[in-house]
Amino acid sequence: MCIRDRDKCTGCGVCQEKCPSKKTPSEFNRGLSNRSAIYTPFAQAIPNVPVIDREHCIKFKTGKCGVCSKVCQAGAIDYDQKDEIVTEKYGAIVVATGFDIIKLDNYDEYAYSQSKDVITSLELERIMNAAGPTKGHLERLSDGKAPKELVFIQCVGSRCSDDRGKPYCSKICCMYTAKHAMLIRDKYPDTNVTVFYIDVRT
């Protein structure tokens, strides 16, 4: 990715609006929406400076276009910028180890790859977020309508005796399911919410 000149960039977003290449699935929204070839990775990114995805940018692929450079009044676009390693000194750091999302390809019984309306908890999180692909509105991905029935299936991939998952409890499913269920019941009181689980450890 080619980072723009962050000292010049004002974060106005015009480059993203005018970019003609808008068919790349958004990584942050888990592929539920598309982004442009020049984009801010997520709404709270620091610095709030867009980056250029070389693989999907028409300028890098064909040598033509350059729309983002033409519309940038601050002159912040730098197509010649190279990757570099920057060393900084800080008084403290936060180590966040993160996690890997379970691959649902091995769980055909849930029809995740067959039905647009079977989603993961992280995809639901993005849908329910006001800055997400549906602006916080709970919608079925198949038809855009609000669901009348919603089912959470807990413990998928946790406490598995086979090699598809992990033998231990993830320790987070219960908490975020309770959060999502309460948010949905509060915002959509006519929606029935059902939770299937092995054990509740909240």
Q: For the regions a protein language model found, what residue spans apply to each?
A:
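Conserved small/polar residues in nucleotide/adenosyl-binding loops
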Residues: 1-3
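Short internal beta-strands
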Residues: 192-199
